[in-house]
């Protein structure tokens, strides 16, 4: 049980850290600049440069994946915090019953 609590605490802290990163104006500006630059270079890329287009597409997908990973960490952290809150608020009788069963 304590392993689960420790893991939940770590996930909750990691989620809070990820949320601070996502909410940071500097991060938001940097990600927007990155995405805008990728789209601009993609638009400027000659049609015959198929390899360059593929690389830019991969870079665009990678940028979105990175943001998605951070968002996933935030959501996992929120769920972990809800689980910790539920364990904390659980009655003593229910805790005893859960240990017996």
What positions do the PLM features span?
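Intrinsic-disorder/low-complexity detector
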Residues: 2-101
